[in-house]
Amino acid sequence: MAFKDWMNNLRDYFVEDDEEFNEPTRPVQESRPTVASTPKPKVEERKVQADYQSRRPAQSTPKPQAQTAAPKRSASTFSKPMPEKIVQQQTVSQAQSLAATVSTIAIKEPRAYADIMESARIVKNGECVLVNFKFMGDAQARRSIDFMTGVVFTLDGDIQNVGGQIFLMTPANITVDAAKEMSILAGKNFESYDIY
């Protein structure tokens, strides 16, 4: 009960009593929004027109030489930004195509099953991941490989055992053609290489 009384006293502290303050009550007037037409659009139109006129070259000069030279100037000023835009677009598209061709491979060495989520996010973002399970126990490594196989299957990617405890996860847009290298790692075809 003491806690309840304390809470009521605390509440009463913040609640105003009408008896303590004998202020006359005034009716609350609702403020209605008034719609007033302002000449702001006209001012903005004038600014736009002024900006447009300031960008246009002066063509009202009375000299005939200036009139013949004015169209050349206006043609050169309007044609100049176009090639710059085209060049910029070409460089941007070249940079994007270069970025699309450059692939990165992340190397991860998870220590627990929870660490494998980071590798799954990387593959989901379209990058390759090389996962080394040397710091993980066999049971957790098998569970992680099952999880990674599901992730890669969902993304239409691929998972390959590169060697021992190392697996390569690739997204759908990247293929790995390493049959010869895989056979070397597996211990086959050593007779084709001369040691001496």
UniProtKB/Swiss-Prot annotation:
Source species, domain of life: Bacteria
Cross-referenced InterPro entries: Cell_div_SepF, Cell_div_SepF/SepF-rel, SepF-like_sf
One Pfam family per UniProt: SepF
Biased composition (Polar residues): 56-79
GO cellular component, one term: cytoplasm
Keywords for the protein's UniProt record, in alphabetical order: Cell cycle, Cell division, Cytoplasm, Septation
Subcellular location(s) per record: Cytoplasm
Protein name listed in UniProt: Cell division protein SepF
